[in-house]
Structures are given as structure tokens and as C-alpha cells.
């Protein structure tokens, strides 16, 4: 049975008739955080336990008695007088959405107004209180406020399951106009509310695209939804051409910096709002954003009508600007009216960490060169096993023109570049070329081969933002010195993994490998033993990559 409002004639108050106890009445209350929201509770009725010492000034509470579901449950409970700031049990009842959530100052918390929200909740004392009788009516008159509770300096942690650094790039052009610009801000505010902004959750900033882009506020400026909402509300309409491409490039290059609050290891996201179509080239800006490891989402509103298509530079601009043209990064709304239903699906996308394919990871931000022993002692059949080993490592990585890059050199006394980092930009092509490498046969000069690879393979891409790795596979002792060339490679920022088979001396493997030697040098007696080493090398590459990002 859902909760219902009934009037109490002559009393000047309304009564909220709450449903009676369900079969799970004996269950212990669920422990929640200070900032668990009503929308996080999926039941019609739930008993929860609020912690003590929550920072009152950072509670986000919308409404009075009936609260928008984006409100903090514990904040609403303190606001209503159900508990004090020392915490305690609270019963939460889900209610339908409504309009006109009012703003009331009570018990040290100033709740905020909200014109409309899709779901609501109310709170009463928890199961230990005397209000357990079935169908008991609870008065909605204001509880005595008493003394204002003391504020604490603690910070809101936010939604830890939605870690992202997000820039909202809003349309501030004459194309959208003042009225739709305000509707756009309202939508962005709703998205920001639902994200669960906090110190350990998502951080957001705002950029306005117009004649010239303007960064309205950075990631580091606000870490609570309340402050972000106020900042969005204060953003003024600029006008001018939309110049979305110019603004996107500016955002990718200038917004996501350490000084501006970007966090290492957290996905960087730009949500671009386009009302109609951009007035400049957005494809190049999308490429720049991907090169900087930024995940670009496009929210397009009001597609051009057939008579306007001639004014659009490129009707496929969305596909060319997003992180990946797979449907995940593009989002369309028919207009700026009735957009509430589009908020949650967009938030779910922004909080799906594993889908952020343009973020820099060990799988898409490395250059890996393979130095393959083609000496006579290997033999053709074993050489094929070495190529299979190389392929199994290479196919793990996200190879593309802006992602991971693979190169291969075969050596005996001589060296032969089988393919360089810039020759192939798809995984299919790279694997096909590896399969077709021809066995050279000859002596073993590993030191010269290392120097050759550093100079001719890594040299041309020295400006690459990717981390460089060299995987050496050899079956015997080198006729020349390996320690000096390997040290030079290390000094050039190249991490070396050495993999030895059969007669390869352990001393040579350690001399070539990066530190710590035990996790960068591997040995197997048989060529068939190379397969288990594949996962060791991949884990090592990812470990070294992550350490370099700290």
C-alpha cells in the first residue's frame, strides 16, 4: 500500500498515512552513509541507520516533509527532526514525484527549492520508535526546531561508484537563445544532482561555447552538488556563433590540468551539448580530445530539418566527434522541454567507468616493440612459437592511430625492422603482419639489435605521450655486450622485459631487464613454455604503466 495524503479538517495540518509493517519487520536497519540519497533506496519502505557527525552544511536536501529523491536521507531526517546529528534509525517511505518542493530552514539545515522531480520520499523515526502500529498517521506539522545544531568541517565524499572528472560544455550561442539556454542549465543541474558529486565521487566543471569559449568554473572549484547548482545558476548567456569545435579543443587542452583539479587515474569526460549543429569543424577537435585521453559525449538537441541541412558543414558531426562511434557516447533529445526522463540514462552512461574507452590505460596508451631472435639456433618451427608469443601479447592491447602502437624487429648479426609503430593502426593488420614474418637465420648480436631498435624504432616517436616498452625474446647468448645498450634504452625511458628460452644466459637476461629484475626477466627451458609467460608480461606492462601515472 502506498502512502497517501489526507486532510485533517480544522487542524491546519495534513496527515500522511503510511503503510503498515511488512513481513521483513524484524530485519536490522541498513547502515547508510551521510550522503546516501532517497533514489539509492529501491524499496517502498526501508529501515536505515544514519551515522553520527554528518556535516550539516554539505547536506543536499530539497523540500520539506516530502523530499525530492535526490536529497540525502540523513539530511532529510535531521531537517525534519526525526534524528539529531548524532545519527540513529530512520524509516524511509518512497513516494511519487511532484512539483514545487519548498525551501525551509529547520534544525540547522536550509533545504532548497526544486520545481519538479520524478520521485520523492519522506522519513519517520526508525523501527525502535513507538510509531510502529499499522496505518499510524504521522503529523506533518513542523517539529520544534530548538537549538541550531553545530556544523562540522567534514567534507562530503560523494558517490564512490561514479569516479569521473566531467566538463559540461554547454551551448551559449545565438542559435540556442536565452530561453533554451536557461532550460539547458536546468537540465545540466539535474544531471549534476544525480551524479553524487563529492570529494571521492565525480567532480564537475562547466565551459560555455560561444564566439570564444569560456571556462565558467573548474573541477577544483566545487565539490558539493549544492555549490555546483548555484554556480550553474549564475552562468550568464554569452551569445555569438556556436563554435563548438573551438570550445571542445580548448576544453581538452586547457581544462583537464592538474592545477585545475584533474585527478590521476580518473576518467576525463566532456559532455558536449549542441542545439542544432556546430558552426565550425568539430571532427578535428574530437581527434585532439581523444589524443588527450578525454571521453567525448555529444548530447544533440533538435536535429536540423531538411531545409536546414544545407547549412550544416557535416551531417555526421556527432559520429566524428564522440570518443567511439558505437552509440554509447551519443545522446539525443528532441527538445529542451520535458527532459527529466533523460537525466538518469545520461548519468548511468557517465558513471560506467569500464566503457570510457578514450581514457588512458595500459591497454591504449603504450608503445610496445618486440625484438625477436632470428638466429640459426632457434629453427623455423620454434620461430613460429616465438611469433605466436608475440601475437598473444599484441592482441591484448587496443591498437589504433590514437591508442596502443606495436612494432617488431628481427635480429641475427643484422637487424630488420619488420614494421614500425606508424605502419599499422589496426589490430587485425598488426597480427596479420606478425604471422607473416619470415625467419632470417644467422648469428646473435643482441646488443647491436637493442641499439638499432632504440634509434630506428623508438627514435621517430620520441614525442609520443604513450609509455614505451621493449620485449626481447632470445634463445641464446649474445656475441656482443648487452648491458651498455640496455642501460642506454633505460635512460631513454624505455622499459625492457627480457624473455629467454633454452640456452639464453640468465645473466644476459638480467642485464637487459629493467628494475626490479625479478619482475622483468623471464626464462623457460622449452619454446612451448612461452605461452604462460604471456600473462606475466602483460601484467608487468600494466603495473609499470600504472606506476608511471602516480
Curated annotation (Swiss-Prot):
Gene Ontology CC, one term: extracellular region
Gene3D superfamilies listed in its UniProt record: LCCL-like domain (2.170.130.20), von Willebrand factor, type A domain (3.40.50.410)
Known outcome of mutating residue 117 to R: In DFNA9; does not affect protein deposition to the extracellular matrix
Residue ranges, annotated region (Disordered): 128-159
Effect of residue 88 to E: In DFNA9; affects protein deposition to the extracellular matrix
Tissue: Expressed in inner ear structures; the cochlea and the vestibule.
Post-translational modification: N-glycosylated.
Organism of provenance: Homo sapiens (Human)
Domain VWFA: from-to ranges: 165-346, 367-537
Entry protein name: Cochlin
Quaternary structure, from the entry: Monomer. May form homodimer. Interacts with type II collagen. Interacts with SLC44A2. Interacts with ANXA2.
A Gene Ontology biological process term: regulation of cell shape
